[in-house]
């Protein structure tokens, strides 16, 4: 279902940013197609997980957290966030290399699943893993959302401002217009319309920000 590129020797290799852009169309689906694909994936992943649980080889057991991660992603794609959280939690209970891309993505998607399932208070536990996973725009933006959902607006603004200092990110806009927009929302909610306008106007042609600018200027 999901492929991971490794070296022929199995050893770690040096990587670099090539500047090449590859468009992956596998998830450019409508809701019905996405649901069918997710259900197919879940069935195959559960079967594989059951197989792995009967094996004792270390190499096979090391695959279990990755399967749990993919199950979590599949349920997340179906917007079944509570189930996604359950699989992410199980996957992260293993002793994992925190530098692996799938582990980083599992942590970040777990955070979004918690927020989407109404578990924002539980998501505050991410403060405890900040030192391990916090060196990216994506994680800092996520922490901004977690603080924002918990009403810790000063902390949220600080995290969003940290996110825009990064040149690259995985999710579009978390190091630019999305972060600025959320800062604007916070300032507007607190009644600081001048500050809100300042950050909304940094969002460029982001429609949501433009709508807020128009509303503030006309009221």
Regions found by a protein language model. Give the residues of each.
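Catalytic-site signature of metal-activated, phosphate-bearing donor transferases
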Residues: 1-79, 83
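"A position-specific structural signal for the A-helix of alpha-solenoid helical repeats
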Residues: 70, 109, 142, 149, ...
């Amino acid at each position: 279902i999901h492929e991971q590129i490794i070296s022929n020797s199995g050893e770690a290799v040096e990587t670099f940013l090539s500047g090449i852009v590859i468009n992956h169309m596998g998830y450019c689906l409508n809701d019905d197609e996405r649901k069918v694909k997710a259900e197919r994936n879940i069935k195959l992943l559960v079967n594989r997980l059951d197989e792995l649980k009967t094996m004792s080889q270390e190499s096979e057991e090391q695959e279990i957290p990755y399967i749990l991660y993919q199950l979590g992603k599949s349920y997340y794609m179906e917007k079944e966030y509570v189930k996604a959280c359950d699989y992410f939690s199980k996957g992260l209970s293993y002793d994992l290399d925190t530098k692996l891309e799938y582990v980083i993505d599992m942590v970040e998607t777990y955070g979004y699943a918690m927020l989407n399932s109404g578990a924002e208070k539980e998501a505050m536990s991410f403060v405890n893993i900040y030192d391990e996973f916090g060196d990216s725009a994506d994680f800092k933006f996520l922490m901004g959302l977690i603080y924002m959902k918990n009403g810790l607006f000063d902390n949220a603004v600080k995290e969003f401002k940290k996110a825009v200092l990064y040149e690259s990110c995985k999710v579009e806009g978390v190091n630019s217009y999305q972060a600025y927009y959320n800062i604007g929302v916070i300032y507007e909610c607190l009644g600081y319309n001048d500050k809100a306008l300042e950050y909304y106007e940094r969002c460029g042609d982001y429609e949501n920000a433009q709508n807020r600018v128009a509303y503030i200027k006309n009221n």
